Amino acid sequence: VNDQQRAFAQRVADLGADVVLGTGPHVLQPVEWVPRADGGQTLVWYSLGNMLNTQLGVDQRTGIIASFEVVPGADGGPATVANPSGVLTWMHYDWTPEEEAALQLDARHALSIQPLAASAELLARTTYGESVEQIAEQSAAILGPLVALSPGV
């Protein structure tokens, strides 16, 4: 997360936003509560990673479907946001080891996106050598302790 992202999140929070969903850096980034000028807090997902794409790195092919609860306020008071959670996703495409070695980028085909937890077979067809569990662990560490991850399968 860079200074511009933090400044933007703080500005939007101070304007009263309850949630900020960031995209752009092509990788997952941390989730934080940012204090607002009105005393409330804003849930900030700095980056949801990638969804449909043909990026090359494991971290660039991992994303999250973000979720959170909107809790009604007591006695007609303002609603609040709680319990950030999500389902990790994996972006798959077919690309033979020979095509990859030759960097034939236009050879990538059969794009699909699905829950990471259901992607063991697809990951085994890549040259990364990483398991669903390893990617999930790395992703959880990046997102931070606020986010409860569910398998989504």
What residues fall within each predicted segment?
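A short C-terminal boundary segment appended to hydrolase-like catalytic domains
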Residues: 59-153
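Conserved beta-sheet core of the metallophosphoesterase superfamily
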Residues: 2-64
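Active-site/ligand-binding-proximal alpha/beta "capping" segment
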Residues: 1, 5-11, 99-108
